[in-house]
């Protein structure tokens, strides 16, 4: 061996492979206020003890590797290693365990969701000793929260910008999602806003395609916004999707939206990536733009019960990265969402402080310190008959978004918007009078339809439409 490469590795070092649990399973560990805590659903391979599986997760997502390395002696593993500090079996599931892991804060770059996820949900999800692995929840410590800007503006600032209080906001996704020319697209936006909606929306896959380039769409939508505002006296908006193939192009679109004077832009935060999303969120705060977030691709990550990452983790990450709205399921529509679990992560988005509540899937108490809240968006297969349930489930601080439930009205787009606005106002009025929307909802809608022919027509069209499938996302 060359003198230049010879080391003293043999001093206090024994090469070879040893069980992870000898170093990374520490049930006696007392978690610190500054630790990031993670709850993993672990399914070990046959023959792998749960303690070894939990320790392997802690090791591979922090300082560990498959064999002992002599450079461990050049640092303090006790300071930097992740620790599996508790393991509990999952009730009703064979060979599944919840492994709790604590990570020292020094492992993570300040203000970077990208770096946090690269460590916690990086290579470890391909680890052979595990049949499946799912990140169920994270506890983000105050010290780390304070390194993030979070939502550009938050719920209260948005209401002040829009001058709209005391009710959910109403939106509509323009359909068909692909194929319209920019001018026809702008026409649909105008009709919906003129009919009484607060927002219209680009669909998540509307970027800048040959049939409708982004600049043309932005111009026609801005015209629709200003025309409808002048005619209704209300502040209106359209979620202009700035998502693009590069961060530079994304920012070019956001800058153009600001120059047009529109109130809000949009980003697909999972397909666009957390680095791009945080960059856009910072720009939106600095330039007075609201930021609507779509979660396209989330079900690839969160749909399977035993592998991937629960949406509550993605929701927390979005609140840190930045967004004023995010799609959060409907409970009653066509998309996945069990009621208590959905309300669990809705509260994680909106509230300043959330207590641990395992009945709603919340594994840790979370304090958001001064980070603004995010408005949950209910969207997907909803119509006027759902309005009482949506108002009761989501409350005032939400956006109720009807795409087909607006544009599918037999009389056209504007009457569809009128029907939804009348239904919402009727539900809010009834609730404020003390009526129970969960019990009297259908009767409230029928009463309102007597003096709104647009609502009556909508009620007739969608009276038989239901999406009754068992939710996959259960405890």
Curated annotation (Swiss-Prot):
Post-translational modification: The disulfide bond which can form in the large chain dimeric partners within the hexadecamer appears to be associated with oxidative stress and protein turnover.
Pfam families the record matches: RuBisCO_large, RuBisCO_large_N
Origin: domain of life: Eukaryota
EC numbers on record: 4.1.1.39
N6-carboxylysine: modified positions: 201
Predominant place of localization: plastid
In-chain residues carrying the UniProt-annotated modification N-acetylproline: 3
Subcellular location: Plastid, Chloroplast
Cellular component GO terms held in the UniProt record: chloroplast
Residues annotated with N6,N6,N6-trimethyllysine modification: 14
Residues annotated as binding substrate: 123, 173, 177, 295, 327, 379
Binding site for Mg(2+): 201, 203-204
Catalysed conversion reaction: 2 (2R)-3-phosphoglycerate + 2 H(+) = D-ribulose 1,5-bisphosphate + CO2 + H2O; D-ribulose 1,5-bisphosphate + O2 = 2-phosphoglycolate + (2R)-3-phosphoglycerate + 2 H(+)
Cofactor note: Binds 1 Mg(2+) ion per subunit.
UniProt xrefs under Gene3D superfamilies: Ribulose bisphosphate carboxylase, large subunit, C-terminal domain, RuBisCO large subunit, N-terminal domain
Keywords carried by this UniProt record: Acetylation, Calvin cycle, Carbon dioxide fixation, Chloroplast, Disulfide bond, Lyase, Magnesium, Metal-binding, Methylation, Monooxygenase, Oxidoreductase, Photorespiration, Photosynthesis, Plastid
GO molecular function terms attached to this record: magnesium ion binding; monooxygenase activity; ribulose-bisphosphate carboxylase activity
InterPro entries to which the protein is assigned, alphabetical: RuBisCO, RuBisCo_large_chain_AS, RuBisCO_lsu_C, RuBisCO_lsu_C_sf, RuBisCO_lsu_fd_N, RuBisCO_lsu_N_sf, RuBisCO_lsuI
Protein's job: RuBisCO catalyzes two reactions: the carboxylation of D-ribulose 1,5-bisphosphate, the primary event in carbon dioxide fixation, as well as the oxidative fragmentation of the pentose substrate in the photorespiration process. Both reactions occur simultaneously and in competition at the same active site.
PANTHER family: RIBULOSE BISPHOSPHATE CARBOXYLASE (PTHR42704), RIBULOSE BISPHOSPHATE CARBOXYLASE LARGE CHAIN (PTHR42704:SF16)
Subunit-level organization: Heterohexadecamer of 8 large chains and 8 small chains; disulfide-linked. The disulfide link is formed within the large subunit homodimers.
Protein name (Swiss-Prot/TrEMBL): Ribulose bisphosphate carboxylase large chain
Lineage: Eukaryota, Viridiplantae, Streptophyta, Embryophyta, Tracheophyta
